[in-house]
Amino acid sequence: MGKVNKTDREWQRELSPEEYRITRQKGTEPAFTGQYWNTKQHGTYVCRCCGAELFSSDAKYDSGCGWPSFFRPLNGSVIDEHEDLTHGMVRTEIVCHDCEAHLGHVFEDGPQPTGLRYCVNSASLQLKTQEKNDEETYP
């Protein structure tokens, strides 16, 4: 998949107000409220904005933080990192490589084998599950 370039107006038409606030304006959903924070379903988490495959449920774990947490992305080229100095903190923001949607942040307090915690807003994701007939579905 190549780079996705859309105007703010196009994103506003395609996303819910909450999805737009989080993915395009770098917002954060309240902890323990997002659709996927406690989901145990198996599948692939894709970018809500462009559909790029980002994380496998095999890398998801319960970090106790209230947001979906993963110890690694599907591969190193699907997510870009940027320094985030907002809110009086120094953090590393993670964005979708293809459309630059704000996903969340990555922290160095995760489990092995990476020691990383990709803390992601549910509104930035969509879970693509596998049905018994192996066809991909979006719940």
UniProtKB/Swiss-Prot annotation:
Q: Which GO MF term does the entry hold, naming one?
A: zinc ion binding
Entries under PROSITE patterns matching the protein: MSRB (PS51790)
Could you name the Gene Ontology cellular component terms for this entry?
Answer: cytoplasm
Q: What Enzyme Commission number(s) does the record list for this chain?
A: 1.8.4.12
Q: Where is the MsrB domain?
A: 8-130
UniProt cofactor note? Binds 1 zinc ion per subunit. The zinc ion is important for the structural integrity of the protein.
InterPro entries membership: Met_Sox_Rdtase_MsrB, Met_Sox_Rdtase_MsrB_dom, Mss4-like_sf
Q: Which cofactor does it need?
A: Zn(2+)
- GO annotation, biological process: protein repair; response to oxidative stress
Reactions mediated catalytically: L-methionyl-[protein] + [thioredoxin]-disulfide + H2O = L-methionyl-(R)-S-oxide-[protein] + [thioredoxin]-dithiol
Q: What class of enzyme is it?
A: oxidoreductase
- Cite the PANTHER family for this sequence: METHIONINE SULFOXIDE REDUCTASE, METHIONINE-R-SULFOXIDE REDUCTASE B1
**Homology family:** Belongs to the MsrB Met sulfoxide reductase family.
| Name this polypeptide is given | Peptide methionine sulfoxide reductase MsrB
Q: What is the lineage of its organism?
A: Bacteria, Pseudomonadati, Pseudomonadota, Gammaproteobacteria, Moraxellales
